[in-house]
């Protein structure tokens, strides 16, 4: 149960870092794709 209680403290910063990184990467690729055409 201790691992289950400690899971949110690891999972929340991970999601907080991963989701903006994916959003930034997709936005960057979208801009790069628009520059080529």
Curated annotation (Swiss-Prot):
**Membrane spanning segments where?**
9-29
Q: Which GO terms describe its cellular component?
A: chloroplast thylakoid membrane; photosystem I
Keyword match Kinase: no
Q: Looking at the Swiss-Prot or TrEMBL record, what is one Pfam family this protein matches?
A: PSI_8
InterPro entries xrefs:
PSI_PsaI, PSI_PsaI_sf
- Membrane topology field: Single-pass membrane protein
Any GO BP: photosynthesis
Q: Does the keyword Transport apply?
A: no
Chain segments annotated as coiled-coil in the UniProt record? none
- Can you tell me which family this protein belongs to? Belongs to the PsaI family.
PANTHER family named in the record: PHOTOSYSTEM I REACTION CENTER SUBUNIT VIII, PTHR35775
Official protein name in the record: Photosystem I reaction center subunit VIII
What organism does the record attribute this protein to?
Answer: Arabidopsis thaliana (Mouse-ear cress)
